[in-house]
Amino acid sequence: MEIVTKDIINLDLKTQDKNDAIRQLGQLLNKAGRLNNLEGYIQNVIKRETLTTTGIGFGIAIPHGKTDAVKDISVAIARLHEPIDWASLDGGKVDLIFQLAVPESSKGDEHLRLLSALSRNLIHEDFRNKIRTSQTAQEVIDLISQSLTKALEV
Amino acid sequence: MNEVKPINLVGVTACPSGVAHTYMAAESLETAAKAAGCDVHVETQGQIGIENQLSTAAIKAADVVILTNDIGIKNEDRFKGKLVLRVSSGDLIGKSPIIVKKLMAKLAEV
């Protein structure tokens, strides 16, 4: 299964706070058949969030759960209707969420390389800007696959 | 005051789950160091395992070693006797350009 598909992207997510955003994205992942246990996954992501914030700055949050509650390694993507607080490292609000779902036993998985390449891409402003101005979920997927292909060739 | 010159940097990044911060921190440090004209090598210790392992030569040539302090770094004894800076992966993600600039300025004073 691809790590990101149209059904786990929401380009206009309406939410007021981070736990609700995590839950909504969890529900998207669950509906797409990518989880074994929705509640277990959500609790794992929220628990991870209490260790250190995943608000990495630049308006981006990367909440993640690594647990057996996940069936297939995935990244759900949301652009928010209104930016929300995420206790970000730079103090700014978050308008773009990349929520990762990783099975506990995914060691050595090729998909982990995709996630690491995506994480690296998020550091670059032009990549973030392109995601922010994408018109459709397909455009987001194309952007990500292009950049990942490039990253994996090197 | 001496002239600020490009420096040789090596780093190792790691984080609790090893899927995202590790790589963002590495990319951010590499990007900032290259932009400042520095030579840079960053090893990642993530869920995938160790990648871009630092060579003995790179460590020897390094003016400074940057290690993330979120979780323990493997094989830290390689850096014995080197100047080591410990920062969080979050700081590298957000502030690498400032960190690199400060290191360059600091080393120019020596």
Model-predicted regions and their roles:
Chain A
Residues 1-154:
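Cytosolic covalent-transfer regions centered on His/Cys nucleophiles
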